[in-house]
């Protein structure tokens, strides 16, 4: 492990076009449940009696807008979450002009909360909301502080700005993410199993020098990586910052 940390530190220190790609494992230490792991959010949602895929779908929003927004308020609004040391480390490298930014599969908005400026949120964010009918925009504080569920303009359901099952990923976001990956000299994957498509397929566009994967479990890209560390991200970053 010590040798891996030394290698990681050397690669990071010698890179000036790092792109980060993050998944659910990065936010677990902030209290955000992993969607798919045992005991994660999907397991909790299943207790509501409907499939997680349906409850997080465009179909459910259209079939039962009231049920959809009540579900979002009950299960998705992570009110007390704060960025952890991994989010802070990524933001610091961007401020130091070593990083092109971060691409994330997460919807918690914690990269932006940590100060990262160049964030491509592939699946949207819970930091923004809008009316499903008239598309009026709302902030997270509008929804949480005022417990606002219906648009004050037209009465429509206020939904989070996330990509639901049955919806397409935002193409401008995909293009920006591809640009970050194609121009990176180092791509650091953190806390992602790299199996959720089409987002995970972006990794195949990396042509730079160093692919680094830090994840508790194996990924389909491990054999292509310069360095693989199967460990907790928070522990790795803490150790890295004390080297």
Swiss-Prot record:
Keywords: Cytoplasm, Metal-binding, NAD, Transferase, Zinc. Nicotinamide binds at residues 35, 107-108. Zn(2+) binds at residues 131, 134, 151, 154. Its EC number is 2.3.1.286. NAD(+) binds at residues 24, 35-36, 105, 107-108, 123, 192-193, 215, 232. GO terms for cellular component: cytoplasm. Its main location: cytoplasm. This is NAD-dependent protein deacetylase. Residues 1-243 form the Deacetylase sirtuin-type domain. The lineage of its organism: Bacteria, Bacillati, Bacillota, Bacilli, Bacillales. Its cofactor is Zn(2+). It comes from the Bacteria.
